[in-house]
From Swiss-Prot:
It is found in: Endoplasmic reticulum. GO terms for molecular function: ATP binding; ATP-dependent protein folding chaperone; hydrolase activity. The lineage of its organism: Eukaryota, Sar, Alveolata, Apicomplexa, Aconoidasida. Residues 631-651 are annotated as: Disordered. Belongs to the heat shock protein 70 family. This is Endoplasmic reticulum chaperone BIP.
Length: 651
């Protein structure tokens, strides 16, 4: 590759502004999903407005948890309930792993804190659990896909039709590999992710859809595991991002961990027992600390009580708001650094910000609100939108824009979060697209060879703000070969960077002399799933869906058989029913039959739905004729078992 003297800028820099127009190739419905670290949320734009949808328990946010217990997979609230009982079998916080390398320092830290096993699979962090006593490994994309699938099911239940398309949000500071991994998770879940939208941009859509006059807003998005800040200007339907910054590993989970560490030390000092030695104990503490943190947003003191947390010891401690704030003071103040950075990048004074919009559950913390208010010289943050639902709300609006649902005049101009470039001689980071460039965008630059008769050039693509590539993040690399022999500096190699509307980068290199070119969509070549892996995971996801369906049918069939047995037993033994009217021989026949059925149930716990249905038929074939015979006798007013709630038009 040529040095700085050897390359010249060619062609153009084109900022192709992303106008969020209708896409006629996509057929609805399209749902909007906030795929969160700790909770997820789904919405849909319908009949001119956004509906945030309830899950099967009536809640509008669903825990991003997946559990594998006794051969059964659970997602959401049911999975979170398993966390204290089966900590190694319950997976959460997977958003902190997706798109990362196993040797990332953040992954190394998470491995010490998360109760489930994280293993190295070709340089990528994978999750290992036991399913039917066999170790089974999942990529983070697969776990995220299970959460996305849950969101899809919630939407399908509401809409009454299949859903294949979605807009999914990601932290603005997610890098290229993390964005691609999120798209892969969508594919595994059977969803075509038609657009990836940055979380603070989605929140701005939720806040400013009806704003007609020019308004500058700062979105402060502090969730369970990630943190973003963006400055946008909204002007009559145009949403332009001026700057974005953040930390993809800072959020409510970190605040919880500080409190847990404090109590773990206190408990060890009092009882000489380390709670970290018992994963169940840690999960019990994690659950109660999260509840305590939420309580402290409305009260100044709360009690944490955990019966038999470990070895017969009870846990009983008070947590005050003041202590919680003291334990997390440095983390709270750390959130101001990205705020300062976006103001500097956007060349904005604090006084130019018209509105401060708080998003994410962690912004309910009073100290966070106070720190922001103090930083902006007493300006009150806007609390007009639900911090838990705003991002999904904005994603649903974006879905409506794509479908042309009365929102054709809305325009989004988002930006790249990090500078993109290639390595040139000496390990220099040569920048092609600077951070906070409006996307989609395209930039070309011409380079040359470093040595005489050099037959190939290696294109190494990085993202980051440092001068040397060793201090930045390698996204991927490829080689352009077949360059004709020539003196150094003579061949002209044009490198073109294209960032699409989802913030995903494509790089192409062309030898201008021969016209030969090569390109790749940069996705962290060591971090992304291959096409074959994705297809296998899609098949695995379908298999899991079939297993879930079979399990539901099995449970339903077992319940039907068990209910029939109990109902029949009550019918022949209850004096208010048929106990005094049934002949002893018939009664013995029924009791023997249902006793045999009970024994069969106990001895065939693994029986499938068909076997259970067949057993019910066999029991009914013996019992029902006897009951029908009795039912026809004078004074026998009790209907046959199983018929109590049946409506009939016949007399």
């Amino acid at each position: 590759m040529g040095n700085s003297k050897a390359f010249v800028l060619v062609l153009f820099v084109s900022l192709l502004k992303f106008i969020s127009a209708v896409d006629p190739a996509i057929e609805g419905p399209i749902i909007g999903i906030d795929l969160g670290t700790t909770y997820s949320c789904v919405g849909v734009f319908k009949n001119g407005r956004v509906e945030i949808l309830n899950n099967d328990l009536g809640n509008r946010i669903t825990p991003s948890y997946v559990s594998f217990v006794d051969g059964e997979r659970k997602v959401g609230e049911a999975a979170k309930l398993e966390a204290t009982l089966h900590p190694t079998q319950t997976v959460f916080d997977v958003k902190r792993l997706i798109g990362r390398k196993f040797d990332d320092k953040e992954v190394a830290k998470d491995r010490t804190l998360l109760p489930y096993e994280i293993v190295n699979n070709e340089g990528k962090p994978n999750i290992r659990v036991q399913i039917k006593d066999k170790p089974t490994t999942f990529a983070p994309e697969q776990i995220s896909a299970m959460v996305l699938e849950k969101m899809k099911e919630i939407a399908q239940s509401f809409l009454g039709k299949p859903v294949k398309n979605a807009v999914v949000t990601v932290p603005a500071y997610f890098n290229d590999a993390q964005r691609q991994a999120t798209k892969d998770a969508g594919a595994i879940a059977g969803l075509n992710i038609v657009r990836i939208i940055n979380e603070p941009t989605a929140a701005a859509l939720a806040y400013g859809l009806d704003k007609k006059e020019e308004t500058s807003i700062l979105v402060y998005d502090l969730g369970g595991g990630t943190f973003d800040v963006s400055i946008l200007v909204i002007d009559n339907g145009v949403f332009e991002v001026y700057a974005t910054a953040g930390n993809t590993h800072l959020g409510g989970e970190d605040f919880d961990q500080r409190v847990m560490d404090y109590f773990i030390k206190m408990f060890k000092k009092k009882n000489n027992i380390d709670l970290r030695s018992d994963k169940r104990a840690i999960q019990k503490l994690r659950k109660e600390v999260e509840i305590a943190k939420r309580n402290l947003s409305v009260v100044h003191s709360t009690q944490i009580e955990i019966e038999d947390i470990i070895e017969g010891h009870n846990f009983s401690e008070t947590l005050t708001r003041a202590k919680f704030e003291e334990l997390n003071d440095d983390l709270f103040r750390e959130t101001l650094e990205p705020v300062k950075k976006v103001l500097d990048d956007a060349k904005y004074e604090k006084s130019k910000i018209d509105e401060i919009v708080l998003v994410g559950g962690s912004t309910r913390i009073p100290k966070i609100q106070q720190i922001i208010k103090d930083f902006f010289n007493g300006k009150e943050p806007n609390r007009g939108i639900n911090p838990d639902e705003a991002v999904a709300y904005g994603a649903a609006i974006q879905a409506g824009i794509i479908l042309g649902e009365e929102l054709q005049d809305v325009v989004l101009l988002d930006v790249t979060p990090l500078t993109l470039g290639i390595e040139t001689v000496g390990g220099i980071m040569t920048q092609l697209i600077k951070r906070n460039t409006v996307i989609p965008t395209k930039k070309s630059q011409t380079f040359s060879t470093y040595q005489d008769n050099q037959p190939a050039v290696l294109i190494q693509v990085f993202e980051g703000e440092r001068a040397l590539t060793k201090d930045n993040h390698l996204l991927g690399k490829f080689e352009l070969s077949g360059i004709p022999p020539a003196q150094r500096g003579v061949p002209k190699i044009e490198v073109t960077f294209t960032v699409d509307k989802n913030g995903i980068l494509h790089v192409e290199a062309e030898d201008k002399g021969t016209g030969k070119s090569k390109g790749i969509t940069i996705t962290n070549d060591k971090g992304r799933l291959s096409k074959e892996q994705i297809e296998k995971m899609i098949n695995d996801a379908e298999k899991f869906a079939d297993e879930d369906k079979n399990l539901r049918e099995k449970v339903e069939s077992k319940n039907n058989l068990d209910n029939y047995i109990q109902s029949m037993k009550a019918t022949v033994e209850d004096k208010d029913k048929l106990a005094d009217k049934i002949e002893k021989e018939d009664k013995d026949t029924i009791l023997n039959t249902i006793k045999e059925a009970e024994d069969w149930l106990n001895n065939n716990s693994n029986a499938d739905s068909e076997a259970l249905k067949q057993k019910l038929k066999e029991v009914e074939a013996i019992c029902q004729p006897i009951i029908v015979k009795l039912y026809g006798q004078p004074g026998a007013n009790t209907p046959p078992p199983g018929d109590e709630d049946v409506d009939s038009d016949e007399l």
